[in-house]
């Protein structure tokens, strides 16, 4: 299914940020998305430990923010800062907040075009 065929599918392109309160990168990312008027849902994993535990187990990382973009129904891309799952194409790695934003915007605008 091509990108254009995905548009209009329920929830495609939705962005969810999984953050923790004392993470400066989390705050920067949220602020930048707000400035760019890109809609997103923020989930503070300190307020929902079950979600944090699930993500840390699934993605084998304890680094935040974790960005999740819904690419299609039941298909997600996770963008995280560090992981041993680099071989999976649904995982993108970033080394700086700028790189995370670049990857995020690439996915976001690909879905919205």
Q: Where are the predicted features?
A:
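Local sequence-structure signature of Cys/Sec-based thiol-disulfide redox active-site neighborhoods
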Residues: 2-41
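A generic structural signal for ordered secondary structure
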Residues: 19, 38, 45, 51-52, ...
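Residues at the C-termini of beta-strands that transition into short coil/loop
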Residues: 21, 44, 97
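Non-catalytic interaction surface on structured domains
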Residues: 28-32, 39, 57-58, 83-88, ...
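Pocket-edge positions in alpha/beta enzyme catalytic cores
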Residues: 40-43, 92
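Thioredoxin-like thiol-disulfide oxidoreductase module
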Residues: 44-63, 68-73, 100, 104-107, ...
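Non-catalytic, surface beta->alpha helical segment in thiol-disulfide oxidoreductase systems
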Residues: 71-113
């Amino acid at each position: 299914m091509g990108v254009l065929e995905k548009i209009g599918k329920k929830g495609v392109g939705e962005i969810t940020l999984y953050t923790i309160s004392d993470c400066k990168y989390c705050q920067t990312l949220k602020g930048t998305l707000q400035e760019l008027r890109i809609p997103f849902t923020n989930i503070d994993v300190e307020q929902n430990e079950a979600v944090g535990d699930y993500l840390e187990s699934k993605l084998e990382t304890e680094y935040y923010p974790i960005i999740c973009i819904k690419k299609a129904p039941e298909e997600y891309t996770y963008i995280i800062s560090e992981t041993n799952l680099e071989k999976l194409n649904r995982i993108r790695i970033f080394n700086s907040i700028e790189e995370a934003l670049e990857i995020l915007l690439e996915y976001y605008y690909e879905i919205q075009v």
